[in-house]
């Protein structure tokens, strides 16, 4: 099977990976959850080429995880905001980060600490 065909299979995992399985996509989504919205913010944070970033953002917009919202008319400039579909990926990213903290830390420093907005207590994502 070719990678282009993965999204056409009857497997939910494969269809999800067709959208999210690229090496930059989850990092772009992570940055969205951290409050980034603008192209230049993503590029400065990730160090990805403009062409690759534009492609990944377009794919996320096309898939429905992000929406492109104008914030300046001349020259035209856009922000990328999470949609309901995109927001639903938050627990997935938290679980992936938790897995990485547990299995891949290798003494590189303290993991990110998550704080519940409503009560202010620290928490660890669990499944």
Residue ranges and their predicted role:
Residues 94, 98-127:
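C-terminal regulatory/oligomerization modules of transcriptional regulators
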Residues 1-8:
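N-terminal intrinsically disordered/low-complexity leader segments
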Residues 11-49:
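N-terminal helix-turn-helix DNA-binding core of bacterial DNA-binding proteins
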Residues 17-20, 26-27, 53, 57-60, ...:
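Generic leucine side-chain signal with a strong bias for well-ordered alpha-helical environments
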Residues 21, 72-95:
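Basic, amphipathic "hinge/linker" alpha-helix immediately C-terminal to the N-terminal HTH DNA-binding motif
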Residues 45, 79-81, 115:
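Short aromatic/hydrophobic contact patches that present stacked aromatics
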Residues 39, 43-71:
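Canonical helix-turn-helix DNA-binding module
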Residues 29, 37-42, 57, 92, ...:
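Extended, folded domain segments that form the structural surfaces/walls around functional sites
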């Amino acid at each position: 099977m070719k990678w282009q065909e993965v999204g056409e299979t009857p497997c939910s995992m494969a269809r999800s990976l067709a959208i999210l399985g690229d090496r930059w996509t989850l990092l772009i989504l992570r940055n969205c959850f951290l409050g980034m919205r603008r192209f230049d913010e993503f590029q400065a944070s990730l160090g990805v080429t403009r062409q690759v970033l534009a492609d990944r953002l377009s794919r996320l917009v096309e898939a429905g995880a992000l929406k492109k919202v104008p914030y300046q008319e001349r020259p035209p400039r856009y922000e990328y905001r999470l949609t309901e579909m995109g927001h639903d990926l938050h627990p997935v990213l938290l679980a992936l980060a938790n897995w990485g903290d547990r299995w891949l830390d290798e003494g590189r420093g303290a993991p990110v600490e998550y704080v519940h907005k409503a009560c202010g207590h620290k928490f660890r994502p669990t499944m």
